Amino acid sequence: MSSRSRSKTRESRALGIALTPKAARYMEKRPYAPGEHGRTKRKADSDYAVRLREKQRLRAQYGILEKQLRIAFEEARRTQGLTGENLVEILEMRLDALVLRAGFARTISQARQFVVHRHILVDGKLVDRPSFRVKPGQTIGVKARSEGTEPFQVAAAGGHVDVLPKTPAYLSVELDKLQARLERRPKRAEVPVTCEVQLVVEYYAAR
């Protein structure tokens, strides 16, 4: 296991969620936090620790920096509706998140790399910012010169289907063509992230 894989696995165990397929397999064998040995009971966390861990869970699943999450939270708070639901919906419209949901990548880290390395198109134009906000009606695709490379051939053949959640209803995908379209704004209940968003709201509200 590479040092990066070990790091993600350890982070997954600490947060109680699998951030990568490899971490998911590891956690099936060792379903307890790092440093624990499966038999000792974990001391009850404080309210602050619970909120902090939930915030860290959300941040880790999107692979973003604290500053990026804070900016998204402030936007969510200004938007009409429930702040927590708005927050997840805003994050879900990031380009790297949708590249992952479409099945073009195996992990959020790989999805981000694809965007940064200029493999991904939005409405036929190259976009190299993972944080790019995709709008309903816009299409996501792979650059023609990149389609024949091994990572995208694996994706087009459905190589990640078994390790990713089912494609959500707000996204239509033609995987064999490496094409996807954001049909509408995501709804929190449809977004496949593990997070008690109200605790995230409480965390930021207290700071």
Swiss-Prot record:
UniProt superkingdom: Bacteria
Keywords from the UniProt entry: Ribonucleoprotein, Ribosomal protein, RNA-binding, rRNA-binding
SUPFAM superfamilies (alphabetical): Alpha-L RNA-binding motif
Pfam families given in the database record: Ribosomal_S4, S4
Region (Disordered): 20-45
GO molecular function, one term: rRNA binding
Record-level GO cellular component terms: small ribosomal subunit
Sequence ranges assigned to domain S4 RNA-binding in this UniProt record: 93-158
UniProt cross-references to Gene3D superfamilies, sorted A to Z: Ribosomal Protein S4 Delta 41, Chain A, domain 1, RNA-binding S4 domain
Any GO BP annotation: ribosomal small subunit biogenesis
HAMAP family registered for this protein in UniProt: Ribosomal_uS4_B
PANTHER family: 30S 40S RIBOSOMAL PROTEIN, SMALL RIBOSOMAL SUBUNIT PROTEIN US4M
Subunit details: Part of the 30S ribosomal subunit. Contacts protein S5. The interaction surface between S4 and S5 is involved in control of translational fidelity.
UniProt record similarity statement: Belongs to the universal ribosomal protein uS4 family.
Function: One of the primary rRNA binding proteins, it binds directly to 16S rRNA where it nucleates assembly of the body of the 30S subunit.
The protein's name: Small ribosomal subunit protein uS4
Protein source organism: Leifsonia xyli subsp. xyli (strain CTCB07)
Source species taxonomy: Bacteria, Bacillati, Actinomycetota, Actinomycetes, Micrococcales
Gene name in the database record: rpsD
